[in-house]
Curated annotation (Swiss-Prot):
Keywords: Leucine-rich repeat, Repeat. Residues 48-98 form the F-box domain. SUPFAM superfamilies: F-box domain. InterPro entries: F-box-assoc_dom_typ3, F-box-assoc_interact_dom, F-box-like_dom_sf, F-box_dom. Signal peptide: none annotated. This is F-box/LRR-repeat protein At2g40920. LRR repeats lie at residues 276-301, 393-416. SMART domains: FBOX. It comes from the Eukaryota. Transmembrane segments: none annotated.
């Protein structure tokens, strides 16, 4: 009898501690995060207790305070929990209301042998802004590794002409079927690598992938150009659908760099020929293409602009802009062309001249743009890296250039030919699960 009373007392104390723990969780501030349960049994107990004692909205509020690693394990407790945590409603709620970490960089490296890695890089700390540190190697087999762009925590890669979508938070990797293009390269022509861009329509909460396929005369000429576009809705039963262009459409080849994704609109720079540049916009919701001419004055000094011009598409003050930096390494100057009126194709120009004390950061160094940060800084990186990896942050508002070293890159990547891509993700955690 005494033993039975003792067991009942221990059970009551255990339940009381659990109630106190949950009550403490509920009283936490919005920014507080719950520590993950130490074992599977406690995870199951917490899940059962939540469903029995709280309504669904309250359960979701509590779940949002757990780290993503705990949510991933909670999905294994039961089908009910898996359905709840994987629901689009909860994933969007988690993404839009919870800020777990500082914006960060993702670095994709690829060597001539086909070896690829994806590295997560911390943001510069307030105490020391001269370097950032590689935190995680997020590589998984078959991930792919070039032409990386991101939207809402999802990454888009291309490998062997197929698109892959990767969520670094959940490790989900989605491979899309190859496109059966209607255009075929004839003798004397070359088929450019397909370019993939991911976007999101917030109205219908739908993710879509856009692909541009182009053929032309053998490079460096861009004669006999022909291009087509395909769109893939990332949903159950999704498939590639050809986009019907508008009347003012111009066949073009996408620029190697110069892509810009603003959620519901995907934009990239392209060349209809060797001497004319355009900005191509694709509306994710309407699936319509728009061609915006770029002023010829941007590249008047270029002999063959499509081959020699160093310019990239960025966002500046909420507007689309072209950062022309061909003269940066020799003259320390760059031009910023801002699209003021899309309908009239009106552009304004602003010339930036580096401070003399910062000229050494760019002298005789060929740089490429790797995107912009949330506060408008342009991310520049050397085309070739040897003894160390670093990037430059260019504040266009204050005309200030800052060098930031990337520490922790594996030694095997030094002093060898490699290709790399960088992308800044302001909210880099997403729990969304995609189906096709």
């Amino acid at each position: 009898m005494k033993r039975r009373r003792k067991d009942l007392k221990q059970a009551a104390e255990s339940e009381q501690e659990e109630c106190q723990s949950i009550a403490q969780v509920v009283s936490l501030g919005d920014s507080d995060q719950i520590q993950p349960p130490p074992n599977k049994k406690e995870e199951e107990d917490i899940c059962e207790y939540l469903l029995q004692n709280f309504d669904l909205d309250h359960v979701m509020e509590i779940l949002m305070r757990f780290p993503l690693t705990s949510l991933t394990r909670f999905k294994c407790v039961s089908k009910q929990w898996s359905s709840l945590i994987s629901s689009r409603y909860f994933c969007n709620l988690l993404y839009t209301t919870v800020t777990r970490q500082q914006p960060r960089l993702y670095m994709c490296l690829k060597d001539d042998g086909g070896h690829r890695v994806l590295l997560s890089i911390s943001s510069p700390s307030r105490g020391n802004t001269s370097f950032v540190v590689v935190e995680q190697d997020l590589s998984i087999p078959g991930m792919g590794g070039f032409f990386l762009n991101v939207v809402r925590g999802l990454m888009c890669f291309s490998r062997r002409k197929k698109a892959r979508i990767y969520n670094p938070s959940t490790k989900q990797l989605l491979t899309l079927p190859a496109i059966k293009s209607d255009i075929v390269a004839q003798q004397g022509q070359t088929k450019h690598h397909p370019r993939y861009y991911i976007g999101h329509d917030p109205v219908s909460d739908q993710y879509k992938l856009v692909c541009t396929v182009a053929i032309s005369s053998l490079l460096p000429r861009l004669g006999n150009l022909k291009s087509e576009h395909w769109v893939f809705a990332l949903e159950a039963g999704g498939s590639w659908k050809k986009v019907v262009p508008l009347e003012n459409y111009r066949h073009h080849a996408p620029s190697t760099e110069g892509r810009s994704t603003s959620g519901s609109v995907v934009r990239y720079m392209a060349w209809p020929d060797n001497y004319n540049c355009v900005v191509v916009s694709f509306d994710i919701r309407s699936e319509q293409l728009t061609i915006i001419p770029v002023p010829r004055e941007i590249h008047l000094d270029e002999v063959v602009p499509a081959v020699t011009m160093m310019a990239d598409l960025i966002e500046y003050g909420g507007k689309i802009a072209i950062f022309y930096h061909t003269n940066l390494k020799d003259e320390g100057s760059a031009d910023l062309w801002v699209l003021e009126d899309t309908g009239k194709s009106e552009w304004s120009k602003k010339t930036l001249v580096l401070q003399p004390c910062q000229r050494h950061l760019v002298e005789d160094i060929e740089l490429i743009v790797k995107g912009t940060t949330q506060d408008g800084k342009v991310i520049l990186a050397p085309v070739e890296m040897h003894s160390r990896f670093y990037i430059l942050y260019y504040n266009l508002q204050s005309n200030d250039l800052r060098k930031v070293e990337i520490k922790g890159v594996p030694d095997s990547w030094f002093d060898k030919e490699c290709y790399f891509d960088l992308n800044s993700m302001d909210k880099s955690e997403s729990f969304i699960y995609l189906e096709t």
